[in-house]
Amino acid sequence: MVKVAILHEGNAKKTNDNELLKLLIQELELDSERVVFFGMGVKSNFFKPEYPSYKNIKNSIENEEINKLLFVIDADYEHNDQKYGGYQNTEKALKNIIAELGFQNDSDIYIVCDPKTQEGYLESLILSSIPLQHKNCIQDFLYCSEFKSKDNHKSILNQIL
């Protein structure tokens, strides 16, 4: 059975990213047996051509076990990482590594972020979808509390869920 490989941040077993992707696959009534997850660890691993998962994927493509790749990666914030942070930097770096690996004909990219700011991560995307009244409440709390965590969206979402 030819499979689709989904490459995402974190580990392959259980992260917010792959749990959400599994729910989406289920909701769309797609065959989950045809999907294999590759947890790439930290974001910078995506941009290392020697990363071990890439060798496994390349072998699986050559053996016709995998015929499609989906790269799911956080945009993060440009002010935190001038090289890979922000939507445009992430997209450029990811397209470069995909071309270097020879995966361009087999790949799609989804950069996870707040669609309005094009920055952030999975939690930013989820929080961007909540009603404005709730979003304002969260922003007011952050302002009043002077809560300055680098991962505000992650912290908030983990408390809400």
Regions found by a protein language model. Give the residues of each.
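N-terminal beta1-alpha1 ligand-phosphate binding loop
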Residues: 2-19
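N-terminal polybasic phosphate/anion-binding patch
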Residues: 35-45
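Conserved helicase/translocase motor-coupling segment
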Residues: 43-53
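C-terminal accessory helical subdomains adjacent to catalytic cores in phosphodiester-
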Residues: 2, 19-37, 51-161
